[in-house]
Amino acid sequence: MARLTVEECMGRTNNKFKLVILASQRAHDLNSGACPVIKYKNGKNTVIALKEIAAKQLDVSSLFNLSVQRCRKYMEKFINSDEPYIAHKPKNNVDIFQASAVAGNSDGLENSSNSRDDNPLGRDNFFSTPENRNNTNS
């Protein structure tokens, strides 16, 4: 059902990425307490937002402007903040790869005594298919 709704919405905007922005803004509005323009029972707010856009019940340009304003407000708050950038983790938050390297495991994952398929994302197995893994590890 969502696929049909998206195809219907493409008549309003020819850019799928802009459609995502529009639908997310409208879903945000609905989650914040805005009343739906169309009646649609048992629907999630994302589907209702897409249905409203497809039914041409919303002004797409004003919806896009609301999204831009929300983004600007977030960016201003983020830029003016004295808080450290989100990518800088506190020192007490050690990731599993660093902890495993300290423990002496070069894979970044715990050693296991189980079968050879316990680590499908290991260095040697990451790009191989399951059939290749079974043939090379036998």
From Swiss-Prot:
Function: Promotes RNA polymerase assembly. Latches the N- and C-terminal regions of the beta' subunit thereby facilitating its interaction with the beta and alpha subunits.
InterPro entries cross-referenced by the UniProt entry: DNA-dir_RNA_pol_omega, Pol_omega/Rpo6/RPB6, RPB6/omega-like_sf
Gene Ontology terms, MF aspect: DNA binding; DNA-directed RNA polymerase activity
GO (cellular component) term, any one: DNA-directed RNA polymerase complex
Descriptive protein name: DNA-directed RNA polymerase subunit omega
Root EC class: transferase
Regions of compositional bias (Polar residues) in chain numbering: 126-138
NCBIfam families reported for this sequence: rpoZ (TIGR00690)
Keyword Cell membrane assigned: no
Keywords per UniProt: DNA-directed RNA polymerase, Nucleotidyltransferase, Transcription, Transferase
EC numbers, comma separated: 2.7.7.6
Stretches for region Disordered: 104-138
Family matches, as Pfam families: RNA_pol_Rpb6
Reactions that this protein is recorded to catalyse: RNA(n) + a ribonucleoside 5'-triphosphate = RNA(n+1) + diphosphate
A GO BP annotation: DNA-templated transcription
Subunit structure as annotated in this protein's UniProt entry: The RNAP catalytic core consists of 2 alpha, 1 beta, 1 beta' and 1 omega subunit. When a sigma factor is associated with the core the holoenzyme is formed, which can initiate transcription.
Protein family: Belongs to the RNA polymerase subunit omega family.
